Structures are given as structure tokens and as C-alpha cells.
Amino acid sequence: MAPSHARPTQPVLSCRDVEKLYGTRDNVTRALDGVSFDVAAGEYVAIMGPSGSGKTTLLNCISTIDRPTSGHIYVDGQDITALRPGQLSKFRRERLGFVFQDSNLLDTLTARENIALALTINHAPAKEVVARVTGVAQRLGVTDVLDKFPHEMSGGQKQRVAAARAIVTD
């Protein structure tokens, strides 16, 4: 077999020497200590460890909820640790979606309205909102609950609606 000369693809996520310190000079907690890894497109990753090992801190840094003390985090080659506040807001708005363990759906909105929320906030045209919400609802199998409120849905339905809300802007 001939050797492959295909160019390796860039990781979708890359962490390089990420450190996070909390506390004061006299009482420092090192939550992350030189974390480095890559995630390729289509790859599934589990972050595992005992309580207090830094899993949530790492996810908070990757998701831009928190900033690392040092090191770099790249999303599709873009160093998100170097973004200024305005750039970071734009990055969050256009590139990130969150699905929390508790679905965090707004109780006063239907599933359809919850899914459409980011598009509505960003003033997307009404036809685009309808098309995107319908498309993502079909892909995630939640078309039957679009007009229901969160208290009328099962836990699994809420999670799928939350996932739809997270990816509707893609």
C-alpha cells in the first residue's frame, strides 16, 4: 500500500498547556495544571475524574465562561484565549451553543420559542427563523412538542429541545 500524503486535518478543539489558578498569593488552588489535548472533527470525548479534579473548570474555560490563567485554547484554529471582550461576545453568539444537565429552558416559552430564542435575539428574518427551527426540530425529533411548554415535556424531550436551541444558529 502506498503511503498516504493526505494533509492532516486541523483539530476542532485544541488545548495547549492550559492552567487555571484560584485564590490569593498565600492560598493558591491549581485547578488545571498544563492540560493539553486535541479533539478531531467527529471525535467523541469524555472528561472524567474525581470530584474536584478540574472537569468543570476545564469545560468553563473551553466554553469561555471562564478564562485560563495561562495556556491557549483553539477552536477551529482560532485562539479564543486571545479574544478581546467584543470579539469574545461575537464568538459566543455565533459559534457556541450550550446544553446544560438541567435543560435551562425558559418556562414561559414554548419549545418552538425556546429554540428560536438566539435567532430572535440576533434579529434573524422571520422566514429564516421558521425554516431553521423546523429543520433542527425535525433532525432532533421534537416536532411533536414544538407548541408545548417545558412543564409539558419529558426530561428527554427537554434535553433534545435544549440541544436544538444550542445548534439552531449553526
Locations of regions flagged by a protein language model:
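ABC family nucleotide-binding domain
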Residues: 10-170
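Pre-NBD coupling/linker segments of ABC/ABC-like ATPases
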Residues: 1-9
